[in-house]
Amino acid sequence: MKIQVLGTGCAKCKELTKRTEEAITLLGLDVTVEKVTDLNEIMRFGVVMTPALAVDGTVKIAGHLPRVAEIQSVLTTALA
């Protein structure tokens, strides 16, 4: 599983990274979070509002800061 946080480094983007790492730990997953900060690369995902979370190359959350539980749900669904 490839997990990417898309954002330019703003406070919300950093918080999404932190919450995503927490969700990964709570789920006991052995994956790392890649930070995508290049605006051109973010735009290739079709994201117009950050922060965003992509799993295996597909944007699952964009434009808001989700709670840890929402991130866990997204990751669990992606594993199924």
Please name every model-derived segment:
Residues 50-80:
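C-terminal structural segments of small proteins and small subunits
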Residues 15, 38-41, 70:
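Residue-level recognition of oxygen-bearing side chains
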Residues 29-41:
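Thiol-based oxidoreductase modules, predominantly thioredoxin-like and allied folds used
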Residues 14-17, 47, 65:
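Conserved strand-to-helix beginnings and helix N-cap segments that scaffold or border functional pockets
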Residues 1-19:
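Local sequence-structure signature of Cys/Sec-based thiol-disulfide redox active-site neighborhoods
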Residues 19-32:
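Conserved helix-turn-beta segment immediately C-terminal to the redox Cys motif
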Residues 2-3, 32-34, 73-80:
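Terminal leader/tail segments of proteins
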Residues 9, 46, 57:
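Conserved functional loop/turn residues at catalytic and ligand-binding sites
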